[in-house]
């Protein structure tokens, strides 16, 4: 029964401001909805709202759909979403859910790929407010809450020469809870430094609400009293596993390579202490056993010296044989010399237009190479190889050993290692560009799937070639294979449509053949990194066998006797669950020439959310695209007008009004999608020509100088009132006026008026300076620690550096257009930009002189629309042109550097940090 059809009116009002009262169309694709009584839901919400504020409980259509989306290709819509903020809340929620027999799913960042972070019941989010950490005095251990992002952990450890050992490709977006609970790994950590191997202790909340800290003696002692039978059963399972010699050997063998299929059985072999077993059972459990509220993990040494080489082989088998050989190389301490070996097949190379691949393609077409069929480009394979060391001398020895090893293989190009970051970063750019290139060029409406398997290293040459042939046999012409060859772990990208039964059948047949190849022939892993989820749940028993699977089921029954924790994940009785509940990806109708059209490339991975300013406040950039896709689908189908109207209404504030529109989300999006462009289009539709808002915007554009002049006396009046009344009285009066009349809220930091009077002094070098509208109009606030407005300081600095400052004509009327762009009045914005461009073109003598703008958001728009002049931001101009002309005396006080969104988008973060380091011995980025 759908939740919103059973709430009575009074409970609807308590649960949410926007509660839909009907189910529309085909919104919920859930294969298995749990039929629950009306009283269960009512009782759950009535009790939950006693300790969870209403604003953190979502039951409206909009936010349930938004929060019900993860990075995978399945969709379930939760009936209730709760954003948790503490362990006590989790404990009470789990006890409450258990008492009403309601299933619960946990979610952190939602970057998982196999359907393990979605729910059709209760979704508990543990992201924001779960970001605590502590580092041990020797920096070799770190304690983390589940909501802290992996990259943030690396930033915390970097000053100590340490790093977070698990290194999934999603580390810049994924949170620790998801990384540990999925045993997510990447290129370097392999099986020796994944979460299971570096975990020291865990703090968990069990299904009955009990909190256990396996690293705390008091907590352990209390648990021994309250859960004696639980511990006894853990010990019994341990002993039974060890007594089964065949099963023990199988567990050792399966975990000698990456494997996250099913529950983690390795703890029963590795540990005697039941508390250690409990802690490590959490790794890879995907929220099916307990809630993970804290982990303590070993940190890893971060090697300072690194070198990489891109190796090219004429066949994929030769490439794999070379990897097998390099895997055997060890240093004097027994450590592996090769730290990473990333294989890229020919389609991967073609997708990013790799220059060596293009050269190879040309050669085999014009003059075939020995042993290669004319025109056959399908063999070329690259292996991006990396080695690391503590010293330069050790690094040179490593390179020598690898080169000697490779001398026994025929490479297409000479082996060349580089230890220069500016060179090897280009290699890694090729590697990181594969996914966005393949996913971004997929056919409209198709889903980008990333499958994930692993083979034992000795099987690599044959297994890789067969996998390549298998994918081609099923007609996936644009699919490519790449991944962590050193660990036998490959990803293959499929651009898959689920729009017809035939396409679903094709995917099903592919996965059946993959299962046969990986399990039956090579006894590998069907999931090496991405979690079992729903995607591989039907195949867990098939891969592991009956004995191991029965142990997993016993563990599940022990931890979750009611079966309420993430049901359907890892354990699923439906053999077809992996081909049900596919996520629709309808097209948003946008002009193909519009920058906003890129949103249709979105794969909903969530990588954008770390940079989204409204994420955690209202909606994230990913969620906006999800919702606009659903709105577009409803508009196209026309079968649910009431639901469409509801979503459009609910979207207005969280989706539209609170989007910053600055495009910072595009910096972490693998496709480079700027969701702000979509927001601008939506706002444009809201303000058509002829509307009152558009007329007001057009009037402002046509009378810009007058509006700026009118603003100055208003600022002056506010400053006078502040002087007469004082801060306290002024704040009280203006707050009342704000509440009564809706006038802008006054603060003590309100600036005084500023009237800019340009003065030009002749000098040898020349620069065109366009002060932003804000800096032309607003001065300093009362009691400002700064003596001069920015414009005055900028002019003085330029003149001190020997520059003649030129100002464009009619500067009072000019604007970059950002104001109108942000409101969706794109035609007016472009008109204002054109006016500015013409004035700057004249002032710079047709681009002869550089142009400086002192506001980074303004400059960012100028750079994106004005191409024929060199435009600079102040820190960039100073560092580039004035650094050698001025004398810097660093102060011995900290300088906090705020890097704006626009500066980050323009790639100026390093520049302003470098400039700050010239000015202070302690430049800090908060």
Positions of PLM-derived features:
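N-terminal flexible segment immediately upstream of the FAD-binding catalytic core
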Residues: 31-99, 109-140, 169, 192, ...
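N-terminal glycine-rich flavin-associated loop
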Residues: 48, 72-104, 122-168, 184-236, ...
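Flexible, glycine/charged-enriched surface loops at secondary-structure junctions
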Residues: 54-60, 107, 165-167, 241-262, ...
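A gly/ser-rich beta-alpha-beta helix-loop segment of oxidoreductase catalytic cores
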Residues: 72-73, 113-114, 118, 151, ...
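Flexible inter-domain linker/hinge segments
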Residues: 225-269, 550, 557-610, 616-633, ...
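Terminal amphipathic helices with adjacent charged low-complexity linkers/tails
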Residues: 295, 300-302, 333-444, 479, ...
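Iron-sulfur cluster-binding electron-transfer modules in prokaryotic oxidoreductases
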Residues: 560, 590, 676-926
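Ferredoxin-type iron-sulfur electron-transfer modules in oxidoreductases and energy-metabolism complexes
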Residues: 571-600, 609, 615-719, 828-835, ...
